[in-house]
Amino acid sequence: MSMSDPLSDLLTRIRNGQAAGKAEIIVPASKLKRAVCQVLKEEGYIAGFSDVTEQGKHNIRVELKYHNGAPVIDKIQRVSKPGCRRYRGRDELPKVMGGFGIAIVSTSKGVMSDRRARSVGEGGEVLCVVE
């Protein structure tokens, strides 16, 4: 069975893993998922991630992060969906929680946080927001 939105699957697995108190989750690998995980790691929302191969299938192991037993990520939500893409110019990128959260943006220079996209002067597709 093909998956219609692999990025939403990643976000849902992160949300469910943290709700269950898991230390790590495993997701099928893709370049976009790796790029999103890299941004989450750089911004301090996950402890880390690594590529693993089990039974010939490439996966990503995401190490979830907690602070005093509570998940670091309060809310992670998909913005641009396959049926309704959301693009924003560099001046229109959302400020999540007044700058305390991040939006992950896919630009022509790669996947990055909204802060970095503003600093390099790029707009793009707003993939998700993290609070």
From Swiss-Prot:
Q: Which NCBIfam families match?
A: PRK00136.1
* Known partners and oligomeric status: Part of the 30S ribosomal subunit. Contacts proteins S5 and S12.
Q: What is this protein called?
A: Small ribosomal subunit protein uS8
Q: Which GO terms describe its molecular function?
A: rRNA binding; structural constituent of ribosome
Q: What does this protein do?
A: One of the primary rRNA binding proteins, it binds directly to 16S rRNA central domain where it helps coordinate assembly of the platform of the 30S subunit.
Alphabetical GO CC annotations of the entry are: ribonucleoprotein complex; ribosome
Q: Which gene encodes it?
A: rpsH
Spell out the SUPFAM superfamilies in the cross-references. Answer: Ribosomal protein S8
Tell me the organism: Methylococcus capsulatus (strain ATCC 33009 / NCIMB 11132 / Bath)
Mind telling me which InterPro entries this protein's record contains?
Answer: Ribosomal_uS8, Ribosomal_uS8_CS, Ribosomal_uS8_sf
